[in-house]
């Protein structure tokens, strides 16, 4: 018997980090919630990262996902912007890891290919396909739609690949070790 798995997708960004929550039961997907966590651009970097940490922690506490998927960082020509994105991505990886949740990572072109059938799809195409796959989804910002696309990608690929166990707390240690072991056991069935 297949059980519902609550999957949180995260689209990291320093200004806006999108999040999207779905349930997957086999190949059936259902929309639960989505939104963005923002940081104040006038604050120093450390305080902006704290805002993202607190916001994502609230999302995890409120929505209790079973698994988390995060978009990988792409390198662009602006090194400073890439570094800032890397900081936000680190928070997006750290928060679920501290909660004892398994985390998977997906490249942007794989997300686009999975959701729209084209690894170079435009944002408008991604949003249209997210709406098609999750008809009840309501998102006002592209960041939330992207996060839902990341969650959809994880739902599509989670049975075919094992989660990257490097993000798991060492067996038997840490407050989330039991929850990670249970989540990984569900994946191995």
From Swiss-Prot:
A cellular component term, taken from the record's GO annotations: Holliday junction resolvase complex
Any matching Pfam family: RuvC
Catalytic activities: Endonucleolytic cleavage at a junction such as a reciprocal single-stranded crossover between two homologous DNA duplexes (Holliday junction)
EC number(s) stated in the UniProt entry for this protein: 3.1.21.10
Keyword Membrane recorded: no
Cofactor(s) the record lists: Mg(2+)
A single MF term (Gene Ontology): magnesium ion binding
Main location class: cytoplasm
InterPro entries (UniProt xref): RNaseH-like_sf, RNaseH_sf, X-over_junc_endoDNase_Mg_BS, X-over_junc_endoDNase_RuvC
Top-rank EC class of the record's enzyme: hydrolase
Active site: residue positions: 11, 71, 143
PROSITE patterns the UniProt entry points to: RUVC
Residues reported in the UniProt entry to bind Mg(2+) 2: 71
Cofactor annotation comment: Binds 2 Mg(2+) ion per subunit.
Alphabetical UniProt keywords: Cytoplasm, DNA damage, DNA recombination, DNA repair, DNA-binding, Endonuclease, Hydrolase, Magnesium, Metal-binding, Nuclease
GO biological process terms held by the UniProt record: DNA recombination; DNA repair
Oligomeric and partner information: Homodimer which binds Holliday junction (HJ) DNA. The HJ becomes 2-fold symmetrical on binding to RuvC with unstacked arms; it has a different conformation from HJ DNA in complex with RuvA. In the full resolvosome a probable DNA-RuvA(4)-RuvB(12)-RuvC(2) complex forms which resolves the HJ.
Function noted in UniProt: The RuvA-RuvB-RuvC complex processes Holliday junction (HJ) DNA during genetic recombination and DNA repair. Endonuclease that resolves HJ intermediates. Cleaves cruciform DNA by making single-stranded nicks across the HJ at symmetrical positions within the homologous arms, yielding a 5'-phosphate and a 3'-hydroxyl group; requires a central core of homology in the junction. The consensus cleavage sequence is 5'-(A/T)TT(C/G)-3'. Cleavage occurs on the 3'-side of the TT dinucleotide at the point of strand exchange.
Family recorded in the similarity comment: Belongs to the RuvC family.
UniProt name for this protein: Crossover junction endodeoxyribonuclease RuvC
Gene: ruvC
